[in-house]
Design a protein with these regions (language model features):
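Short, low-to-moderate order helix/coil transition modules at the start of elongated helical scaffolds
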Residues: 1-214, 220
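Conserved beta-strand/loop scaffold segments within soluble protein domains that form the structured core
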Residues: 2-5, 124-382, 396-424
Length: 424
């Protein structure tokens, strides 16, 4: 089915429709999958990309900000990178394609393309409502990824890293991961560009965490300076499940990272920590929708942002507490350092509480470096530039140091330090 339109579209919207018409013969999927693909792109064509008039996209005018849509998957060569933590297992999606030979001891690992071909992926491709532009784009174009299952009782002695590496073009991947009961594991989801043309990247991770499991999940995004990165995490926490989620954005020209989290099991707990490093004329938007659906659950969210030059950042955090979710304890904070007069950051915290026996709160700060702290360091002979760098590094490193794996802390601090050295 060729997508036709008579509506007035932007060049990016037109390019998406033309790319789908050009690529559909090569995309994997059975009839049911293509019925979903066609319908979702048709909806995107009819409604267009979101503008500021759409509440969820008010601070990110996606329709006008999205300029670059490569026509195909790109011809660049991408290779797997060394593990973030030396010696840890790595499986990679290179230029949008997963490996037939990927395997991890004691886990079930399959290519997502196989789920598209046999139709098993059709249900999961659905968008999360009328404003889910990322879900629609990804479902329309997704080619591959991994489906990973952790059996009950699995304990990993090193982080498992899934790398999404590209060298330009259109790259659309999917990562459904199911953790059974009583699993203990650390998972690294790493997105990175190597030298090559600019890219439009979309990635959807579907994470289900079973009863009593304790999971640390790290998203490390280091796309190229001209890349668009559209990331989405769909997370479901079961009974007594514990999730520590760390999201680090340190790249990309236009970034939208969405977190849809359901605390669906009694006794479940979420710890979310985010670091957003912005420079140049980039735009990064982190949007979270967190639902506490049952009694006796908890969550804490702390987001740290550093904004240089003419960059623009956004954090939208919505916490919804259902009527039956008594004894919910939810706290959210967003703290931002603006490092230039032209830098901007918008914060929109929201609470929707329908239960009466809860403890919920939120707070936000947007400021320059504390003058007293800067004076203290300079009074001891430290040059101003170095003193500023030390304070910025300490501001974000505090988040990373909450991780228990010292090798992982060291690796992530290295990423942060390298970014700050380049941009500060």
């Amino acid at each position: 089915m060729n997508i036709q339109t008579t509506n007035r579209l932007t060049s990016a919207e037109t390019a998406l429709i033309e790319a789908y018409n050009d690529q559909m013969g090569d995309l994997p999927g059975d009839g049911e999958v293509f019925a979903v693909r066609d319908r979702l792109l048709d909806e995107l064509k009819t409604a267009g990309l979101p503008t500021r008039r759409v509440e969820a996209w008010h601070y990110t005018d996606f329709k006008n900000l999205l300029r670059l849509v490569p026509s195909d998957i790109g011809k660049g060569l991408a290779e797997a990178l060394p593990a973030t933590v030396e010696g840890s297992p790595v499986i990679a999606v290179l230029q949008g394609k997963a490996s037939d030979k990927a395997s991890v001891k004691n886990l079930t690992v399959a290519r997502y393309a196989d789920s598209l071909i046999n139709g098993a992926a059709a249900v999961g491709l659905e968008a999360l409502g009328k404003d889910d532009a990322i879900g629609r784009i990804n479902a329309s174009f997704v080619r591959d990824g991994y489906v990973i299952d952790f059996p009950d009782g699995t304990e990993l002695d090193a982080p498992l890293e899934v790398q999404f590496i590209h060298a330009g073009g259109q790259i659309h991947s999917r990562l459904p991961v199911t953790f059974g009961a009583d699993v203990k594991a650390t998972f690294i989801e790493r997105h990175q560009a190597v030298q090559g043309a600019a890219a439009l990247v979309s990635s959807v991770s579907e994470i289900k965490i079973g009863k009593g499991s304790e999971i640390t999940w790290i998203v490390l995004q280091e796309q190229g300076s001209e890349d668009t990165h559209l990331g989405q995490l769909r997370i479901d926490l079961g009974e007594d499940a514990k999730l520590k989620l760390f999201v680090i954005n340190a790249g990309g020209k236009l970034v939208r990272q969405e977190l849809y989290i359901k605390v669906a099991g009694e006794g479940a707990d979420l710890t979310l920590r985010g670091i957003n490093l912005l420079g140049g004329d980039t735009h990064t938007d982190v949007t979270m929708v967190l639902g506490h659906d049952v009694p006796n659950t908890g969550s804490t969210e702390v987001i740290r942002n550093v904004v240089f030059d003419r960059a623009r950042g956004v954090f939208q955090g919505m916490i919804r507490v259902a009527p039956d979710a008594q004894k919910t304890d939810a706290k959210m904070a967003c703290n931002t350092l603006l490092m230039s007069d032209d830098a901007e950051f918008s914060v929109k915290p929201e609470l929707e509480i329908f239960a009466d026996d809860v403890q919920c709160g939120h707070g936000a700060t947007v400021a320059d470096i504390d003058g007293n702290h800067l004076y203290y360091l300079m009074a001891r002979g430290i040059p101003e530039k170095k003193a500023r760098a030390m304070l910025v590094n300490a501001f974000v490193a505090e988040i990373v140091e909450e991780l228990e794996d010292e090798a992982l802390v060291e690796a992530l601090e290295g990423v942060i330090s390298a970014w700050l050295e380049k941009h500060a």
